[in-house]
Amino acid sequence: MNYLAGDIRAQLPARFNQQQKAREELAWCAANAEKAPNRGYLREVYYQQAKLAQAANEPEKAQEYLRLSGYRDLNRPLAFNTAFAEDTATGHTFVPRRISEPVPGRVYALSGFEFTEYYFVVSDDGRELIGIDAGTRPDSAKGAYEALRAYAPGVPALTTVFVTHAHWDHVGGFSFLSSLNPRPRFYARSNYEEELTRSLNAPPAFEKNFFGERFDMADVRRFKPDVTVDRPTELRVGGTRVSLIPIPGGETSDGLFIHLPDAGILFAGDFIMPYLGAPFIEEGNFQGLLDTIDIVTRLNPRLLLHGHEPLTRVFTSPVMLAQLKTDLAWLRDQVQTAIRRGDERALIHQANLIPPELLASHPDAQFGYLLLREHVIDRLYDQSIGYWQADLQGVEHLSRADHAESPGRLFRRLGGTTHQSSRTDDGRREV
């Protein structure tokens, strides 16, 4: 309530005399930041404080509030109160930096240090530290590891790292973690090289947008585990029982669950990343996703920890995933029927496909379905058709330069003549 009241009062014209009340409410918000859904809400608080200070002829305060808001000036076109952030050098983060303890004193989750999550587990005997995944870049892995040791100086040395899959953001920090003394032992799925090759051959246009200018594909190329796993494997690390479970999908072909059965914890990696595989490379296994959900429900973990903070927040429990599986199977049937009917992809999206039982299901399953729907349609469509699509995409090969041409010039170059093309009253061209 204070957030909305302060934000609205700060924007009212001066004749309403609400500036002081706005200052008080915004100051309360800044002082009680831990009560906000996420720290992204403070951006608008600081921005409105900056505008109030500027109007009160307090330029130094205005500049400080503006700096805290993250905006460049006092003319921002849109208000952002999201948890995520973008940085040219370090890339995307889903949430502000924080360290939490899903199991106090035993399991540490490091969020917001880069694109992916870091997890560390203190072994049952207290003598070894277990890591889950290696992060995106050596510098971010170093920052996260040092932050953990500053936060919990009594944790033991890192001895073991289990890698859930060989995507860029889960192996790119390998060179830092492998440089520690003593050197940790790395475990991965036996077919990790297949996924690594797929990642290394991906178009380069996207990687730095996600992972920042500091990202270097050479860091991904350096990844080489000490032990590979091709079947369900159980071992003990410092007395902690660990089950390594190869999974059939759905993001990558080399997925590996890290299960701590005695603690009821499952480190799930990115098996249910909404894109169903990175959207800019050919991967993703929808049936594998459904089969992997069955594995989760069979294991029935008390804690389900994913490779990215929003996944942990959204895909929360085996019960929710079981409901989601039913909804996704229905969606696949609808998409496949539409493809056989010859519908173009845009029409399938516009159909607003909603399972009959969705509205009666748990709200968590509703949100999860809506989050996945667009990308499941895209992936299934991509994997079900050839290079000639129903809307004739792929029949003609147009470059960016072609798209930049005027319609008439492009029409003539593709074989049309001037008498074949005419302009209607509303400006459209008809043949």
What spans do the regions from the language model cover?
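TPR/TPR-like (Sel1-like) alpha-helical repeat modules
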Residues: 27-31, 47, 51-54, 59-76
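C-terminal regulatory/interaction regions
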Residues: 70-80, 340-431
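Active-site HxH/HxHxD metal-binding segment of metal-dependent hydrolases
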Residues: 149-234, 255
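Conserved beta-strand hairpin/beta-sheet module of binuclear metal-dependent hydrolase folds
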Residues: 96-151, 256-260, 264-269
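Divalent-metal (often Zn2+) His-rich catalytic cores of metallo-beta-lactamase-fold enzymes
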Residues: 287-347, 353-374
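Core dinuclear metal-dependent hydrolase active-site scaffold
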Residues: 102, 120, 228-262
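Structural signature of alpha-solenoid helical repeat junctions
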Residues: 1-4, 21, 34, 41, ...
